[in-house]
């Protein structure tokens, strides 16, 4: 039997081959040069891999599954381009962000173009087209809502952990839910099955984002392909920050208001007060919830999806 990491490597290579084959016009260069630059990036392809694993579970048509995978990855890249502008990040996947390489106006247009490309690909699927587009667009809108909430929450000291969890379900969970559920929609599975896959992906997304927030503080900048600690400097209300603010009010205020403090000071604070431990446990709970959702599937359909959860849970970048 093929090893799981060999399977995901194969899916990633096949996906990259299809993405590189996608016809991107040469002109106008103002639009298509930054799009080509973005899509040549060495992403982890977590979302396309999930689409393909879900497609394998439901025995979906391979060509249609690939189109779904392309569509969700394009939407993901569209959000990254615009997020980088909003967060003023200068590096993504180890290379300059689009707005840093060109300018904000170019990056905005490139993101718009990539989003439109995703729509064209999804609408070219001949089976269940309306249902796929409706589900896909609802998830895409939720991602935008989540990003809006993330910006609204910056430096807002009234934000609670429930607010944060609602935000990450939209910003990260909705698209991963779509990755898991769209193959079930394609294969005309029951509403109960589609919903279970959506909830599976949303729980996976919550665990993914909480884990990502931890990597933003405790990760290796070389593996992450970017500098760390920007969540702190931008006033992001992550779960760690909310717990610190609510339960270690004076110590957190002194630390966060001291502009001379370094990332290592924050690491020590979160570890010493067992905030890191609590947040890691929270991520584990969401990964566990994701596992429970797919246990309604036949056993042979669960194995690869459970392996995927473990892969996401143990990632270091």
Model regions and ranges:
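Mg2+-dependent prenyl diphosphate-binding active-site environment of isoprenoid biosynthetic enzymes
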Residues: 24-253, 310
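Short, amphipathic C-terminal "tail helix"
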Residues: 299-317
């Amino acid at each position: 039997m093929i090893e799981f990491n060999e399977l995901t490597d194969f899916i990633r290579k096949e996906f990259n081959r299809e993405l590189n084959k996608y016809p991107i016009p040469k002109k106008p260069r103002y639009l298509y040069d930054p799009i080509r630059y973005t899509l040549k990036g060495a992403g982890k392809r977590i979302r396309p891999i999930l689409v393909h694993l879900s497609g394998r579970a439901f025995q979906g048509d391979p060509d249609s599954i690939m189109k779904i995978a392309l569509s969700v990855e394009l939407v993901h890249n569209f959000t990254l381009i615009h997020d980088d502008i909003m967060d003023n990040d200068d590096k993504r996947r180890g290379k300059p962000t689009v707005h840093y390489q060109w300018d904000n106006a170019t990056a905005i247009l490139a993101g718009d173009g990539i989003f439109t490309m995703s729509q064209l690909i999804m609408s070219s699927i001949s089976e269940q087209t309306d249902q796929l587009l409706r589900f896909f667009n609802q998830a895409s809108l939720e991602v935008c809502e989540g990003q809006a909430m993330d910006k609204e929450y910056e430096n807002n000291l009234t934000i609670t952990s429930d607010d944060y969890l609602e935000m990450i379900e939209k910003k990260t969970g909705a698209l991963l839910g779509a990755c898991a559920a769209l193959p079930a929609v394609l294969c005309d599975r029951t509403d109960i099955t589609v919903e279970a896959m959506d909830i599976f992906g949303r729980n996976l997304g919550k665990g993914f984002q909480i884990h990502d927030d931890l990597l933003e503080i405790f990760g290796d900048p070389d593996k992450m392909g970017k500098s760390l600690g920007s969540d702190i400097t931008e006033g992001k209300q992550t779960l760690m920050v909310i717990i610190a603010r609510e339960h270690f009010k004076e110590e957190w205020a002194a630390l966060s208001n001291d502009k001379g403090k370094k990332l290592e000071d924050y690491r020590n604070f979160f570890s010493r007060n067992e905030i890191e431990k609590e947040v890691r446990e929270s991520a584990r709970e969401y990964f566990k919830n994701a596992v429970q959702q797919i246990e309604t599937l036949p056993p042979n359909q669960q194995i690869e999806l459970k392996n995927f959860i473990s892969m996401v849970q143990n990632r270091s970048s």
